[in-house]
């Protein structure tokens, strides 16, 4: 590891220096919390027996315009789902959700994860060891200068997060998800209709 000394510039006031010092301390956490600890993984799905709700058998792709999505979603949801943003660490109420149920795409409502695959990863984002079968697609992401595996809703293409190879058994994978990209449906409630 390289140590960097932060020395205030002669024209920099104390408040500005402390602000920059704070950002310098937080930046490594934000960059490493959702970074791979090993090579880029292949996607794995959870067995159908782990589903809590009955999944839709057929779901045609949902292709809405940017204007339509902006009207339906909050600014933060849109930024994460359709501009591949990342929410602040530990900001999602879903991080502490422990009830049995199904996590659905916040955009189109496609079921993506069973609560049975959710676990506490210590990263500050909701994490799962596998998605429901056939509900997410993946692609290569090199925006940070190295290769990661991005995953998104198979129906609307809404960005969910990235896959890393530091998860628990049985897959060894961690689906690091943005909480704003999901909605939770408890087991005793019906899944909402897919958005059209």
Regions found by a protein language model. Give the residues of each.
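N-terminal secretory signal peptides and thylakoid transit peptides that target proteins
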Residues: 7-26
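Residues immediately within or flanking Cys/His clusters that coordinate Zn2+
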Residues: 102, 150, 173
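Short cysteine-rich clusters marking metal-coordination/redox-active sites
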Residues: 105, 153-156
């Amino acid at each position: 590891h390289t140590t960097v000394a932060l020395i205030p510039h002669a024209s920099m006031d104390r408040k500005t220096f402390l602000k920059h010092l704070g950002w310098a301390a937080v930046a490594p956490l934000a960059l490493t919390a959702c970074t791979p600890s090993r090579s880029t993984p292949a996607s794995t799905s959870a067995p159908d027996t782990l589903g809590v709700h009955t999944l839709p058998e057929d779901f045609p792709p949902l292709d809405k315009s940017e204007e339509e999505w902006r009207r339906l979603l909050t600014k933060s949801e849109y930024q994460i789902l359709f501009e591949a943003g990342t929410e602040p660490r530990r900001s999602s109420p879903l991080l502490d959700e422990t009830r049995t149920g199904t996590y659905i795409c916040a955009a189109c409502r496609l079921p993506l994860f069973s609560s049975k695959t959710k676990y506490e990863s210590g990263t500050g984002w909701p994490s799962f060891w596998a998605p429901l079968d056939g509900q997410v697609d993946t692609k290569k992401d090199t925006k940070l200068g190295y290769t990661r595996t991005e995953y998104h809703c198979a129906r609307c293409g809404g960005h969910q997060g990235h896959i890393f190879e530091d998860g628990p058994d049985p897959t060894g994978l961690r689906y690091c998800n943005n909480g704003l990209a999901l909605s939770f449906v408890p087991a005793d409630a019906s899944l909402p209709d897919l958005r059209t």
